Amino acid sequence: MIPVTELRYFADTQPAYRILKPWWDVFTDYISIVMLMIAVFGGTLQVTQDKMICLPCKWVTKDSCNDSFRGWAASSPEPTYPNSTVLPTPDTGPTGIKYDLDRHQYNYVDAVCYENRLHWFAKYFPYLVLLHTLIFLACSNFWFKFPRTSSKLEHFVSILLKCFDSPWTTRALSETVVEESDPKPAFSKMNGSMDKKSSTVSEDVEATVPMLQRTKSRIEQGIVDRSETGVLDKKEGEQAKALFEKVKKFRTHVEEGDIVYRLYMRQTIIKVIKFALIICYTVYYVHNIKFDVDCTVDIESLTGYRTYRCAHPLATLFKILASFYISLVIFYGLICMYTLWWMLRRSLKKYSFESIREESSYSDIPDVKNDFAFMLHLIDQYDPLYSKRFAVFLSEVSENKLRQLNLNNEWTLDKLRQRLTKNAQDKLELHLFMLSGIPDTVFDLVELEVLKLELIPDVTIPPSIAQLTGLKELWLYHTAAKIEAPALAFLRENLRALHIKFTDIKEIPLWIYSLKTLEELHLTGNLSAENNRYIVIDGLRELKRLKVLRLKSNLSKLPQVVTDVGVHLQKLSINNEGTKLIVLNSLKKMVNLTELELIRCDLERIPHSIFSLHNLQEIDLKDNNLKTIEEIISFQHLHRLTCLKLWYNHIAYIPIQIGNLTNLERLYLNRNKIEKIPTQLFYCRKLRYLDLSHNNLTFLPADIGLLQNLQNLAVTANRIEALPPELFQCRKLRALHLGNNVLQSLPSRVGELTNLTQIELRGNRLECLPVELGECPLLKRSGLVVEEDLFSTLPPEVKERLWRADKEQA
C-alpha cells in the first residue's frame, strides 16, 4: 500500500509558490489529498479482498432468486424447478443446503458474475475517484507547469522575496518607526535654522524611504538635519539598485499580456464544470452500490446452475466512501465557485496602490495591470505586507532616494555633462528631476546657465553654487528650496530669471524677495483670492529690476503686489486657466509695458485700460470669450503695436476700423467664427503674418493683393472654393496654408511666388497640381504638403526637382 506521505507529491508545488496560493487553493489541495486517500484505500481493498462471493440459487422465480422455499411456494402454487433436476422435499426442520460444486467452479462463477452483473459504478468507483482527483490536481497546478506562465511566476516570486528581504525595505520601515516615535519639538524651529546653518550645506540625504509621510508640523518647521543612521553599505545599495532595475524590466514584460490571468480563469472554470459533472452522475449512480446481487448467466452447462445470489463484500464500505467523496466534491465545488465569483466580481487585471500612496510618501507609485496586477491580487490573499513592501520598488521617488545614499559617487561630472542640453534660447541647462538632493558635482559645471530642480523635496542650496559663475536662470518646480546665506548672496548678484511652480503658495521660498537683480519672474500655481494675502509682501516690491512677470493661476483680480511691481515691467503675462479676470483698471499704471498677454481670462470685451498703454508692441488675448472686438478702434492710439493675437475666441466679424492699425505686422485671428474679411483689413500694408485658419470663410477678397509684404498666410480649415488671382501678387509669400478647404483647382499663377518654401493643400478637392509649382525655386518636396496620389499628377521632371531639392538640403 502507498504511504500517505507519498501522496503529498501530487498536491505539493514548489515551496516558493506557496505565496501565490490563496486560501481556497490550499483548501482544495488538501481536499485533493483526502480524495487520493479514498481512491488508494478503495483500490487497495478491491485488489486485496474478495470482489464477489456467489452461491447457486435453488428456488428461482422469473429469473429472481427467492430467499426461501416458503417464499417460492407462496408465490407459485404449481412449482417448477428451472435451476435443478432434483425435486424439493417438504421442510421437516432446519437442514443445510448442499451443492455439488468444487472450488474452481465457485471461482469461475464469482469472476463471471463480477464481470457481467456487477454495476460499473460499483466496480470502478476507486478508479473514478482517482481519475477525477488527478484531473483536479492537474487543473490546480497546470499554471505552475505551463512554460509561458511558470516562467513569469518563478521570476515574480524570486523578485518578490528579494524585495521583501531587502535591507532597503527593512531600513525604510525602521526609519518610519523612528520618525513616529521621536518627532522634533516645534520650538526647535528657530534654533535648528540658526545653530545648524552650516550643517545644511550639502545635506546628507535620508538613507531610507519613509513608509509614512512626515507630520505637517515637521514640514512647516523646515528642519534640515543630518541622518546618521540607516545608511546602507555599498553592497546593499548596489543590490537594492539592481532590484529596481529587475522590477522595471519585469513590469514591462509582464504587463504586456494577461496569459496568467486567463489560464487561471480557465482552469477554475474547468474545475467548476468538472464538479457539476461529478455530482450529477455520482449522486445518480451511488444507489447501484449494493451488497446483494442476483446473477443470471448462461453457464448451466458448466456448473449445473443458471441463477446465483452474489454478495459484494465491499459494497457497504464503498457506499460510505462514496458518500464521503460526494461531500468532499461538494465542498470542493463550492470553493471553486467562490473562486470564480471572486474573479468575476473584482477587476483583477488592475491593481491600485492608492492606499499605499495615501499612507506613504510615494505618491508616484503607479497602478499596474494585466498579469502583474493579477499576481499582486493573489499575493494580497496570502499576506498584503508583500505587496506593500514590493511597492517601494515601483516608486521612482524611492529609487531616487536610494541613489542619494551614494549620490556624489554615482553622479560623476561626466554623467552630468551628458544630461546638459540646449534650450530654446540656446542656453546650456541641466534638469534634475525627482532626486533627493543636488549632487556636489553639479557645481563643477561652471558653464551651466540654467538649472532646473523639479520635485526635489527638502533641498538645500549650498554655498558651492557660487562656482557656477554662468548661472543666470533657476527653475524650482514643486521644490521648496532652502538656501544658505553665502549661496543667497551669490544669487542676489547673479540670478536674472526665476521660474517657480507650486501647489500651495507656501512653497514659494521667502528668500526670492532678496534677489534684487532679478529681471524675470514666472509663477505657476494657486494664486486665488483667499491666498492673495500671502503674496502681498513688501519684499517683492524691492525687485526694482524686474522686467518680465508671468503668472499662470486662477486670479479673480490682479494682486496688489503685481500692480506695485508693474511700474517698471516691460512684459506681463497672465494665464488664468479659464477663471474670469475682472478689475483690470490697475493695468493703466504699467506704462512701460511693451508686451501684454491675457490668456484664458474669460474676457468678453477688450479691456479699456489697455488703450492707455502707449508703449505696447504686442497684445495676446488668446482663448478668451471675445465675441466682438469693436474696441479695436482704440488700438489706433497704440502707434507701436505690431502684433495682435485674438485667436481661439468666438469673434464673428472683423470691424472695418482694423484698417487704422497701419503698423500691424502680425495678426492672429485663427480659431474664431469669422465669415467675411473686410476690405479695410488690407490697408494694413505692413502685415507679414496673417492667420485666419479654422474660421467660416468662403472666399478671399481680391484686395488681398495689396499686402505686398505678406510672407505667411494661413486659411486652413475654412470653406474657400477658389483663390483670387490677386493673391499671387504677394510676391514675398513664403508659406501658404490652404489645407482642409474645398478648392477645386490651384491657379497656375502659383509659379509667380518665387519665395514660396511651403504650401499646404491637403484635404481639398483638387484633381491635379499645376506644373507651374516647379517654377517656385525655393519649394522642396517636404514643403509641399499634399496627398501622395495628388503629388503623382505632377510631371516627372517637376517631382524630380522637388525631391532633389530635399536631398540637397539634407
Swiss-Prot record:
Residues with attached carbohydrate: N66, N83
LRR repeat residue intervals: 411-422, 423-445, 447-468, 469-492, 493-515, 518-542, 543-565, 567-589, 590-613, 614-637, 639-661, 662-684, 686-707, 708-730, 732-753, 754-776, 778-801
Annotated Gene Ontology cellular component terms: cell surface; lysosomal membrane; monoatomic ion channel complex; plasma membrane
Result of changing T48 to W/Y/K/N: Impairs activity in hypotonic solution
Motif Di-leucine motif: chain residues: 706-707
Cytoplasmic side: 1-22, 143-264, 342-810
Modified residues (N-acetylmethionine): M1
Mod. after translation: N-glycosylated.
Reaction equation(s) it catalyzes: chloride(in) = chloride(out); iodide(out) = iodide(in); taurine(out) = taurine(in); L-aspartate(out) = L-aspartate(in)
A GO molecular-function annotation: cyclic-GMP-AMP transmembrane transporter activity
GO-annotated biological processes: aspartate transmembrane transport; cell volume homeostasis; chloride transmembrane transport; cyclic-GMP-AMP transmembrane import across plasma membrane; intracellular glucose homeostasis; monoatomic anion transmembrane transport; monoatomic anion transport; positive regulation of insulin secretion
One Pfam family per UniProt: LRR_8
Transmembrane domains' residue ranges: 23-47, 124-142, 265-286, 317-341
Topological relation to the membrane, as annotated: Multi-pass membrane protein
Alphabetized Gene3D superfamilies for the sequence: Ribonuclease Inhibitor (3.80.10.10)
Matches recorded under PANTHER family: PTHR48051, RAS SUPPRESSOR PROTEIN 1
Family note: Belongs to the LRRC8 family.
Function field: Essential component of the volume-regulated anion channel (VRAC, also named VSOAC channel), an anion channel required to maintain a constant cell volume in response to extracellular or intracellular osmotic changes. The VRAC channel conducts iodide better than chloride and can also conduct organic osmolytes like taurine. Mediates efflux of amino acids, such as aspartate and glutamate, in response to osmotic stress.
Name recorded for this polypeptide: Volume-regulated anion channel subunit LRRC8A
